[in-house]
Every structure is written in C-alpha cells, then in structure tokens.
Amino acid sequence: LASTTDTGTERIAAAFAAAPGRAALMPYLMGGFPDVDGSVAIGEACADAGADLVELGVPFSDPLADGPVIHAAGTRALQAGVTLHGVLQAAARIAERLPVVLMCYANPLLARGVERFAGELAAAGASGLIVPDLPLEEAGAVREACDAAGLALVPLIAPTTPDDRLQAIAPLARGFLYTVSVTGTTGERTGVDASLAGVLARAKAHSPVPVAVGFGISTPEHAAAAAAAGADGVIVGSRLVRAASEAVDAGTDPAQAVHDLVAALAGGLRR
C-alpha cells in the first residue's frame, strides 16, 4: 500500500498503476452495514480477495442514485444508528489496506461544511470523494476543499452527458472519472450495454485520469466485458451489497460472501 504520506489522489493513481494490463476492481460497500465493525470486515475481505480500491457509501435517507438493494442496506444502517462518524471510523480502518473513496450525497456534506468534511475525510485516511448529486456549478468549493486536503473529487458522467458538458467536467476530474454505464439508478442488469465502448472512448478522450465504470456490473463476465470495452476500472455495488444482506438475513458471514464474489470478479479481470 502507498505510504500514508502520499495524498489521497496519489494513492488512487498508485492503485490504478498497480493494475497494469487490466482494469482495477473497486467494490462498493455500504458504510456501517451491517454495523461499523461488519463493514470493516467486508472491506478487509475485499482486500484479501483482490480488490484494488474500495468505494464506501455513506447511508442517507433520500439516495437519488441508489437502486433498491443499496437503498435498503443504507436504511438498515441508519436504523441501526450509524452516523457519518461511524462511517469515517470504518473508512480509517479499511484505508489501512486499500485506498477508500467515500460516496456521500450533497446534503450531509453541505450540512457539515465543505472544508470541515474534507478535513475529516482526509484525517480518516480516505483518498477520495464521490458526490453523485453535486451539480457542476456547485462543485468548485468542494473541489477546492478536496484539493487542499489532498483528496480526489471524482465526478460522474452518464451516457447522456453532452459533449460540451463532458468537456467541462472531465478536465476537473481527480483520481478517476466515474462513468455511469447506463441511465438510471444503481442495480444489477443482464449485461453490459453495447454502446459502452463508445461512451468510454468519448470519456477517455477528455479525461486526464483513468476512467472507471459503475452501475449495472454484477458478474465476472460483466466486469471482463467492461474492461474489454476500455474501462480502466470496474465498480461493482448492488451484487455485493445484496450478498452481504442475504448473508446477514441467513445468519451467515457477510464478509465471506462478499470475499467469494470479489475473488470471482478479480479473476474475471485477470484472465
């Protein structure tokens, strides 16, 4: 793992660079689900299974981009009393193994204050921040705070993002550019859209940093197809959160369930 003196942006760059000739694998997990210690165990299982980075969600009451599986896990975490403080505690422990990119909606971020939030995130050892509902027009202050704290503010683009907007967003990307593979919310889908290669080529033409794909990737075959379409990184969320939720409901170990899936996904990217 990169030394703790590196900035978060540098740790993310190192994680992508350490995956030569293949796409980096970034599992998404819900912070504080099933509880803080449980989410740390899941994050450590991801590291053991071959993940390169981890995306850690902050549970929120009105998550616009989350599909039903991730929304339900976030609701359970909130009902169990998980707070942002607890998620940052989990981030600090997972960050000892892998770079952690926090996914947080704008409301908790703005309520806490942008500079304070960025400082707390950096102090926890996190490497980056994704704010899915942060408008480009309001991103300036957040990006300045993240830059000052050494954090990568990772923007999202969609297949429907027009060229002029892509040209405005991509050069400001830090760490990586998050490309949403489909229009809509997160969730499992039957396959990788045939148009993905074109979407990725357009993104990579404008992006100074690696381009990662998320939303709708749930199998090793999907992951391999996204990589073949040109993705520098592959983000898998709903499938892993569903496995963790099913394990909790069944009284089995969610960390083991996620480990087995991440190992299979990592294998799909290492073929």
Question: What is each of the regions a protein language model found here?
Answer:
Residues 3, 11, 42, 47-49, ...:
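Active-site beta->alpha loop and helix N-cap motifs at the rims of alpha/beta catalytic domains
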